[in-house]
């Protein structure tokens, strides 16, 4: 890990850990837990879905059975989109802003390096969270899809999903997004 990556990755890890732990206090059974960022690699937030939240969403919105899989993994429809962002991600925002002031956005090579570093920091954080066992709270880990996802999604989401999860455990997600 590079010296530039470590502080950013650790800050994202700490913020996401606090947000996920607070969220998991509700005792619901989670199957979707992600860090989200934009195609510009802005500061990430978390999003999550639980079995119980999906059931409430489907019932409240009269979602037809055949459409449920599309909502099941939709960060935009998640009631837990950006959960804990204001409370826990302020240091992350500050670090990103500090890095922004050092970047020449007209220099494509410099921007690509920064973009890749930011995504690597997010992947580092989600892997570190996984290693702590956090995604096994309230449900077995193999039932939880984890990832660093982009808004809007792109093919790199699939690559990261396969590196962070057992492909057998995310068959449904893969059938929708690949």
Language model: regions and residue ranges:
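Short N-terminal edge-element motif at the start of the domain
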Residues: 1-30
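Alpha-helix boundary/N-cap detector
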Residues: 3, 7, 11, 83, ...
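Charge-rich, solvent-exposed alpha-helical interaction surfaces
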Residues: 11, 15, 19, 91, ...
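N-terminal interaction modules that seed assembly of large macromolecular complexes
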Residues: 23-64
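A short, structural micro-pattern
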Residues: 27, 67, 138-140
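Glycine-rich, aromatic-bearing surface loops/beta-hairpins
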Residues: 131-178
């Amino acid at each position: 890990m590079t010296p530039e990556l470590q502080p950013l990755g650790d800050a994202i890890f700490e913020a996401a850990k606090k947000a996920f732990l607070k969220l998991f206090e509700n005792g619901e059974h989670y199957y979707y837990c992600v860090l989200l960022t934009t195609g510009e690699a802005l500061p990430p937030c978390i999003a999550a879905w639980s079995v119980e939240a999906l059931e409430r969403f489907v019932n409240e919105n009269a979602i037809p059975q055949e459409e449920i899989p599309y909502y099941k993994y939709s960060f935009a429809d998640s009631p837990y989109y950006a959960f804990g962002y204001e409370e826990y991600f302020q240091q992350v925002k500050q670090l990103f802003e500090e890095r922004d002031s050092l970047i020449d956005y007209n220099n494509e090579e410099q921007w690509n390096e920064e973009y890749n570093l930011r995504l690597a920091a997010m992947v580092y954080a989600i892997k570190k969270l996984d290693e702590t066992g956090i995604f096994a709270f309230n449900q077995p880990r193999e039932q939880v899809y984890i990832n660093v996802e982009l808004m809007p999604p792109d093919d790199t989401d699939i690559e990261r999903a396969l590196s962070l999860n057992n492909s057998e455990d995310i068959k449904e997600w893969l059938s929708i997004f690949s």
